[in-house]
Amino acid sequence: MSAHRQLRLGTILHGASGNMSAWRHPAAIADASINFDFVKETALKAEEGKLDFLFVADGLYINEKSIPHFLNRFEPLTVLSALASITSRLGLVGTLSTSYSEPFTTARQFASLDHLSNGRAGWNVVTSPLEGSAKNFSREKHPEHALRYRIADEYLDVVKGLWDSWEEDAFIRNKESGQFFDPAKLHPLNHHGDFFQVAGPLNIGRTPQGRPVVFQAGASDDGKKLAAKHADAIFTHHDTFEEAKAFYRDVKQQLETNGRRASDLHIFQGISVIVGNDAEDVENQYQTTAALVSINDALNYLGRYFEHHDFSQYPLDEPFPDIGDLGKNSFRSTTDEIKRNARERNLTLRQVALEAASPRPRFSGTPEEVADGLQAWFEGYAADGFIIQGGTPDTFPRFVDQVVPVLQARGLFRTDYPGTTLRDSLGLEQPKNTFTQQ
């Protein structure tokens, strides 16, 4: 392992963790998605383990078939602002959609979070996959996939430009002279594009990190292109080492075409983990959680990926139905993978639904075995880091207490935070102000 390359770790607040029915688990906090004591405990545990960040996902549409913890959960920026006051080094990353918000407001919100946290804010950029989102924002139609990414591209140009409105030392605040700021260090944006007309400047100063860290979630071609141009990190998910390695290579090559270095963007694989004493213990933990998922729950979960399609209309024990292009305008990369996997393995609808709703954790075993898996993917250049989700409701504390020390002993993961900001933790350079380079 290169002395200059360190494994990165984050965790996700995802209800009770485990699968969609894990809130029923004996060890679960049933209202975890709206329980701030649980949220606080998770954040403090992550910081105890020296993790890079805690990530709060989000969505803008629900119905009666939605995943239970999606029905009642905190808005990301609100809960992250609360966590800023009780943590000191942990990065705070939240999702916000470019399809259903305005760049000025987004730039202001994440700049505020970066100031509140002394430089620990991160924005996970999504374009919103669920078509029902349009109904909650006075829209007649959800934008098509390609259009959403064109909007996101310009949106990010605007937000980053607004974050550069003020130079770092623009606010003089000289009481004797009465000069509050230096006008020469204020830069209106005056953006006129295809989708946005934004004058600027932003009404909050340059942030402790220069700019909050930009994450992008998605594995489609459009998503990879957007990340290679704009992002500091990308969230993705692949089932095999070979798929993850191919994705890693592709994104890193696209960075070069954008004049960026491979080290300018970290690739995080989202993984589920079970830590146990031995193989029998791990299997018992998995089966206990998997048994909580009914076939109806599984069909509803699967349908969410396919624009809330009703899969209950098909025979359960016949081959996965031909549903054409359904899913191409929602979770495109995920639905393509589900259909391909079902076809190649000749899976029934029942098998596809249960595998989707209660997948086996990618990395499971003793602490040493889990660490072995993470190390193999990291050193094999299939990932720069991982977003840890517990395969059971009580897995994450075990991961911090038992797996992190193994990674630290192997020199893969740090034993303390290297600085105070999220960029410090991730080893990312502070971006220069684009206006001062002109």
Feature-to-residue mapping (PLM):
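N-terminal beta1-alpha1-beta2 module of alpha/beta enzyme domains
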Residues: 1-86, 209-212, 326, 420, ...
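Acidic (Asp/Glu)-rich catalytic clusters
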Residues: 2-4, 47-48, 80-88, 114-120, ...
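An alpha-helical appendage that flanks or caps ligand/catalytic pockets
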Residues: 2-17, 146-209, 242-249, 253-376, ...
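Hydrophobic faces of well-ordered beta-strands that scaffold small-molecule active sites
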Residues: 7-11, 54-56, 90-96, 119-125, ...
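Conserved, mostly hydrophobic/aromatic
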Residues: 9, 46, 50, 83, ...
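Active-site mouth loops of central-metabolism enzymes
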Residues: 22-37, 95-104, 140-142, 208-221, ...
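Alpha-helix-loop-beta-strand connector modules within alpha/beta enzyme cores
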Residues: 67-93, 257-258, 397-415
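Hydrophobic or amphipathic alpha-helical targeting/insertion segments
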Residues: 86-87, 91-137, 143-146, 151-155
